[in-house]
Amino acid sequence: MTTLPEKGEGIFGYKIMDRTTVSMLGAQITEFSHICSGARVLYIENDDRELGFNLIYRTPQLDQSDSNHILEHLMLCSCSRYPSRDIFFDMDSKSYSTFMNGLTDNTYTCYPVCSQSEDQLLKLMDVFLCCMEEPDALKEDYFFRREALRYELENEEDDLSLEGTVFNEDWGHLTDIQENADSFMAETLYESQTASHLLGRAHFHYKDISFKRIQERFKKFYRYSNCLIVLYGKMDVARILDFLDREHLSRFPAADCVDNDLLSYFHEPVNRGFFRCKGESPAYEGNPGNNNRIIDYGIDLSGCSEDDLVYWIW
């Protein structure tokens, strides 16, 4: 394994913030802060031959248009250095990756990729990072219309239809009674707050989707000072850190970024008291709905200690 400096020391433009051991993973954990860009790097160092890289951005759901999910689809379409119709599928079919994806959650968006070849991982990292920095999908709306929302007319006699990869994915959950129950729960616990917004609701809020809104989300979220980079496995981490610093991170100083206090979205005051909500979930005509019922009981755990959380989980 690579010998790294001690906590508080520096290497390749990074300062080591913390070092610890996680016996469950058989790993030494090192946390770095990149001085120029403000990015955080977490290296999980063990003997696993499977090498991993993950870009994680803090992306609170500011509304229910599923714009963060749309942006995730757009980011790995094409970029200035690697132009393509869909670079994600190019990489998937032409590289030695063992896992590759883009994932959107209610609080973050991440882009993991794995390979057993360090050289391949470096190349894939370069593609991912270039796409995060200069995505072609935000320069003109071709990719937006493909992945987000567009009108289609098959024949003159037909009605206009709404299409789009993310829109259709969300539409597929229209009658998902559990997802609709989750949405009612969030809206009841966190009325008028960011936490009430869940992903996957574009089919209900498609009028709020716009190319301009997607561009604004990119400027707000996609900067290295709002990014955690995770490295995993038995790798030449000095080589990786040098590559990240030289080719990418140092090109985007934190001082040049718009300062957005994204953490404030996760610390909004919680409505106190007991609330009750009754909601209805759509069902297709002919589907029996008499026995489809869900009763949820939710508790807000904001401000709980670690001991409290363990108690509630177990």
Residue ranges of model-derived segments:
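N- or domain-start disorder-to-order transition segments that initiate the globular core
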Residues: 1-48
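Low-complexity, Gly/Ser/Pro- and Lys/Arg-enriched regions
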Residues: 19-21, 286, 303
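Catalytic glutamate of the conserved HExxH
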Residues: 66, 70, 74
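Generic recognition of long tandem-repeat/solenoid scaffolds
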Residues: 28-34, 111-113, 277, 295-297
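Short pre-active-site segment immediately N-terminal to the catalytic Zn-binding motif
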Residues: 56-66
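Charge-rich, well-structured scaffold segments of protease-associated domains
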Residues: 1-12, 60, 74-83, 87-269, ...
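Short, conserved catalytic-motif segment at the N-terminal edge
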Residues: 49-53
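Short, low-order "capping/linker" segments at domain edges
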Residues: 269-286
